[in-house]
Each structure stands twice: as structure tokens, then as C-alpha cells.
Amino acid sequence: MGMMEEFKEFAVKGNVVDLAVGVIIGGAFGKIVTSFVSDIVMPPLGLIMGKVNFTDLFINLSGKPFDSLKAAKDAGAPVISYGVFINTLIDFIIIAFVIFMVIKQINRFKKEPAPAPPNTKECPHCLSAVPIKATKCAFCTSDIK
């Protein structure tokens, strides 16, 4: 089998295609959650906390005063952007929770596999486990029905 045939077989396998679709949908879902956090969750939270815009929260490490995170970054000042980190953390928590709920629902619909039929039975004389088709116990040599 040539390299092209091997690649074609690999590329069209169900798992590869499923993975590609999952990555694309996951990327789009991440953008939706980021927008949800930035545009819907954080503004009311910032208002409750005294009109704080979390994306502008930072610690200035340069010692020079800056009015905003953008001004500090434009000046090349070293900063710790903990407000952006808070937004990212909330994004992660929401995504993790949604994925947990989706997987929980998917697992609810999965059918449990039927239990395997027993392949041994108990000898009524010595109580040892013997193969289901056995007519004589290998341990005590008693006849088994």
C-alpha cells in the first residue's frame, strides 16, 4: 500500500473526522462563551462591584503611573493583568461546567451493556467454581447436573 493510500485511509477514518469536527465546534463554542462572559456576565458584576471593568484591572510593576492597562502596555511597562486572568478563569469555569452537563446528559442516554452470561457454576458438593458445561467437578470429582 502506497503512502497516499495510507494517508487517505487515515484521513477518512471516523475518529479523525470526528476529532476535526469537535475541534472546530469547540473553537466556536469557546468564542461564544468568551463573549457571554465579557459582554453579559462581567458588566453587571463590575457594576455591582463599583463600576469596575475587570479587563482594566492590573498591577503596574514599573512604578510609573498609568491610567489604564492599554496605556501601560502601549508604554511597554511590565504589568500583571489580573483582570484579564479573572475573565479567562470565569470563561474556563463556564466551559468546564457546560461540558460536564453535556457529557452527563450523553451518559444518561447511553445504554448499559448487558451483563455477560455466567461462564461458571458452583459445584453443589464442594462449592468450587466449575465451567458451566462441566458434568463432573474437577475439584471433588462429583457428578454435576
Curated annotation (Swiss-Prot):
Cell membrane in keyword set: yes
Location in or out of the cell: Cell inner membrane
Transmembrane segments: 16-36, 83-103
Any GO CC annotation of this UniProt entry: plasma membrane
Topology with respect to the bilayer: Multi-pass membrane protein
InterPro entries: Mechanosensitive_channel_CS (IPR019823), MS_channel (IPR001185), MSC/AndL (IPR037673), MscL_channel (IPR036019)
Domain of life according to the entry: Bacteria
Pfam families the UniProt entry points to: MscL
PANTHER family: LARGE-CONDUCTANCE MECHANOSENSITIVE CHANNEL, MECHANOSENSITIVE CHANNEL MSCL
Function of the protein: Channel that opens in response to stretch forces in the membrane lipid bilayer. May participate in the regulation of osmotic pressure changes within the cell.
Family matches, as HAMAP family: MscL (MF_00115)
Protein's name according to its UniProt entry: Large-conductance mechanosensitive channel
The organism of origin for this protein: Geobacter metallireducens (strain ATCC 53774 / DSM 7210 / GS-15)
Gene: mscL
